[in-house]
Amino acid sequence: MSNVRLALLLLLLLVSCLPALHALTFDPSGAVLGEQKTVVLLVEFSDAAHSMSSETIHKLIFAEMNRYYIEASFGKVSVAGKETTQWHRLPFASAAYDLAKPTTSDRERIRFATDAVYAADNEVDFKEYARVIILSATTVWPATVRMNVATHDGVIVNRAVIASESISLSALVREYGRLLGLDYLCDQTLFKAGRYPGAYLGSWDPMSNCLGFDEFGRPEKLVHFVAWNKMQLGWIEQSQIVKIKPGGTNFTSLAPLGSGGQGKLLVLIPESSKSYYMVEFREKTGYDTNLYDHGALITYYDGKTPLRVIDQNPMTSYFNDAAFDFRPGRLPVYVNPFTGFSVIVLENKNTLLKLMVSTAEKGKIAGKAERAIAEANSTIAANRDQGKTKGLEEADGFLKLAIDAFTMAKFEETLTLAKQAFEKALGATFPEAYTQAGKLLNQTRTKLEEAGRKPYKSQEAVKLLEKANVFYTQGVDAYEEGDWATALDLAQKAQALIEEAFRKEDEFAKQQETSRFLIISGAAVLLIALAASAIIQRRKKRK
């Protein structure tokens, strides 16, 4: 055996025999509560100096990340500590570690983390800390490293986050979650089937996206952990979990998972002793304001593989629209025929989600009722867009009653009322104002065209016609927008102005005729007077 191997064995033996060793580890079966004392090791290389200030890094970890964990844990966890006072230089150049790729081997990561711990060992008293973060001046693919490094303080560092100095907040939260004992929520079955990066939980949990961007290639947004993770860490109390066995009918209400930790937060439906379905309410509040969608998020844990999302819209290749909800464009009913249960979203008040967990058969009836509501609603909307509003008030009334019946889980009654709403919507017609306005606008157009074919001599009439044309144009716009009453009013005003213009033109023509008559009459009188004067003059000369 070589001297080097012998020395290593003696070192390991010595380390294993030290009585005062304190392991920085995590018991997955226990809760993570209280202040998490964290040290940040800043490291650089002979060929790569740092560019970020320690103040910027301190703010990222002990202000921004701390703020996130306080909210996500409902005040049960905070992050405190400090970064090293200097950037410690590692013994090898940066290229020797090859840490920029996600495919970097664990051996290389462990070597880097070990060198970082040793480099900072003289400065840091590791007994004061429970968590270790190592930030490098070079590009490092974020990861959590398992290792076994003994320090001068009698501490074994067995886990640490390694990342670049420029790590994003969302990536930092994810890797710190690994330090707390959480797993990456990557569904490898879906991943291998080609749903990339939708093979994760989409954007519903920081632990589900290890790529740094969402399913559409956009930078990921920081949201709350799913209820499963919060339950594992002890942040959700047992009194906040509603356990419902399949087979019966139960009603419950959930508070939003990101609203502060008050009320019921999780419905748990066991499938077996190790597998179960979970329902949580995700609403745009707190960090969950960054969610792309909201509603009842249903997840499944089979006891072995990572958590899976039950997708209400499996036709899309992403999970951003996976939540169930009672609103247009979403399904409120999940039916599991194998386990024999259903989850029905009865009402979403934004601050409270009303749920019914029942049999699969009841879920099928609820699904029919919801589809009847959707059909009636779409028919009403289509007719309203076309302008067929006469009769829609009755359809709207029946639809409202149907929705009210659904929220009270009266699904048979919902079906009846929704069908009545649909039938009333089918019978909707255009209102009288629609017909009258259309007819009058056509008449107005004809009169304006007629007026345009002849010259008008009255300036007052011309101005009236110009104003009538403005009213006509505005009336056509209102008609196209479905404002029949305004269109009718404008058409009537245009008609009145046209009639007034015709009258003014007639008056002007009569005035012109009268003026011509007076001129002719005056000329005739003058001629007669002149003739008479001439006759008188001739008579005087004869005398």
Range-by-range predicted roles:
Residues 358-543:
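Long, charged/polar, soluble alpha-helical segments
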Residues 9-19:
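Bacterial N-terminal signal peptides
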Residues 126, 131, 136-289:
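Extracellular hydrolytic enzyme modules, especially secreted metalloproteases
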Residues 17-27, 538:
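Sec-dependent signal peptide cleavage junction
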Residues 51-109, 203-239:
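Predominantly extracellular/luminal regions of secreted and cell-surface proteins
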Residues 1-8:
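Bacterial N-terminal signal peptides that target proteins for export
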Residues 30, 39, 44, 49-52, ...:
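Non-catalytic C-terminal accessory/binding modules of secreted extracellular proteins
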Residues 72-156:
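Active-site-proximal segments of metallohydrolase catalytic domains
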